[in-house]
Amino acid sequence: MTALKNDRFLRALLKQPVDVTPVWMMRQAGRYLPEYRASRASAGDFMSLCKNPQFACEVTLQPLDRYPLDAAILFSDILTIPDAMGQGLYFETGEGPRFRKTVSTLADIEALPIPDAQQDLGYVMDAVSTIRRELNGRVPLIGFAGSPWTLATYMVEGGSSKDFRKSKAMLYDNPQAMHLLLDKLAQSVTSYLNGQILAGAQAVQIFDSWGGSLSSAAYQEFSLAYMRKIVSGLIRENDGRKVPVIVFTKGGGLWLESIADIGADTLGLDWTCDIGEARQRVGSKVSLQGNMDPTVLYARPEAIRQEVARILASYGSGTGHVFNLGHGITPEVDPANAGAFINAVHELSAQYHV
């Protein structure tokens, strides 16, 4: 494969020296960009974007053509795995993801197949290899998947949820069923991420979007334990380089020490954590990614710059920090403000890497 022209993202994840703090944004290929909206209109709908490797490649590269980002992230969706299990994923306009089938009993879960990454999710692997080829070494490519708990909530609820009442009822009423579902999902995520790595992903991230909804005890048993299982099963070196693993639990600030213990290279932080305190708490065990509040991007560029400066100062000197938002960029953000954010990270961080 082509040598990387910019590897500071991978170097920071592995706590190797960098010249400036690398930066990318969760959902950087998204609705805030007019070129993304045009591609989505051409594709017809969101899933057609995901399932066509050429469209997926096109939208993955759009933010890189606009901004000096230090990483690309595969354009896809965390719900491709439940879709490949036969749940029938579709998107209602303005309502987010829905499933035609849900799981509610042990029998439902026992009947679920474990998808084959190449056969059932081959379109994702094709997208990864297409993007790697088109990137031609500009920056590394990140692959990703949802955490078992997060995927399970969508499969049990049938879509997004405010209180996760069906998922949590199953967790407490029928833990055997929930554990079986999570185990099947952990196996599926492991093979899916390994497929992405073999197709060319140079780092992978596990998105535990709803882990923070759980009690401390339930988080350890029903979310963290399964992410640990995935991390232990991932390919960690490919194409002559280490493949770093990032784990991100939104709302996981209470459990940073536990998350840092599961064997991942990097811990993603949401905006409710102080990154300097997080660095003290986890020590040298992992690198950190984050963690500006995405809504800061609605402020003026000078205010964005001030917040970037504050977070950089909180983290302090040295490598081991990848700058990101504390969650995904939102659709109404002015693209110029995203550019101001990225430029501020590069301009203001050099002093911390002398």
Swiss-Prot record:
Catalysed conversion reaction: uroporphyrinogen III + 4 H(+) = coproporphyrinogen III + 4 CO2
Summary of the function given for this chain in its UniProt record: Catalyzes the decarboxylation of four acetate groups of uroporphyrinogen-III to yield coproporphyrinogen-III.
Family annotation (Gene3D superfamilies): 3.20.20.210
Subcellular compartments: Cytoplasm
One GO MF term attached to the UniProt entry: uroporphyrinogen decarboxylase activity
Annotated site (Transition state stabilizer): D77
Assembly description: Homodimer.
Matches recorded under InterPro entries: UROD/MetE-like_sf, Uroporphyrinogen_deCO2ase_HemE, Uroporphyrinogen_deCOase
Cited PROSITE patterns: UROD_1, UROD_2
Pathway named in the protein's UniProt entry: Porphyrin-containing compound metabolism; protoporphyrin-IX biosynthesis; coproporphyrinogen-III from 5-aminolevulinate: step 4/4
Keyword terms of this UniProt record: Cytoplasm, Decarboxylase, Lyase, Porphyrin biosynthesis
Cellular component GO terms held in the UniProt record: cytosol
HAMAP family: URO_D
Protein's name according to its UniProt entry: Uroporphyrinogen decarboxylase
Keyword hit for tRNA processing: no
Taxonomy of the source species: Bacteria, Pseudomonadati, Pseudomonadota, Gammaproteobacteria, Pseudomonadales
